[in-house]
Amino acid sequence: MKDKLLSLLLIFATNCFSDTSEQLNNFFNNELFFIQTSINKLNNISDESKGTYIKNDDKSIVIEINSPFREKYFINNNEIKIHDLDFNQIKKIPINDKNETMLINFLSDGFPKNFNNKITINEKIFFIDFINENTVQIKFKDNMQIDNVIKFYKND
């Protein structure tokens, strides 16, 4: 009896993880609107950025920030190209370390079947949770210990 219960729990847990992975992969295949809120608790200052997220058929990603400034990010397996639309400048950053860009890899290539809601990259922890079927939230502290929350919304 105890073994059967344990087996059922393991099957349920595996299904939950694969369902979460599949749901996240389906969610991030949509054109999304996002709001990123950064909260500096030391200074009690809050900043907000707004923009769009698009994953292309070739698995490249385009992120456009519309507020408070205008930037466009083109992300592929080799580089991140940043267009500062206000100053008409372009900066290219090569992607050398795939561990550094694990979150980008998941967004581009898909979340693994055994994914839970946490990613650890160089001691930074990212929590990814569904708020509801149309909203996903990513929470993390950046390298300056500022709390960041990015909420992605499906465009309906």
Describe the residue ranges of each PLM region.
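Flexible, surface-exposed loop/linker segments and immediately adjacent secondary-structure boundaries
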Residues: D86-I125
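Boundary at the C-terminal end of the N-terminal hydrophobic targeting segment
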Residues: C16-E22
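Hydrophobic/aromatic beta-strand elements that line small-molecule binding cavities or substrate pockets
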Residues: S49-I54, Y73, I150-K154
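An acidic-aromatic
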Residues: I54-M102
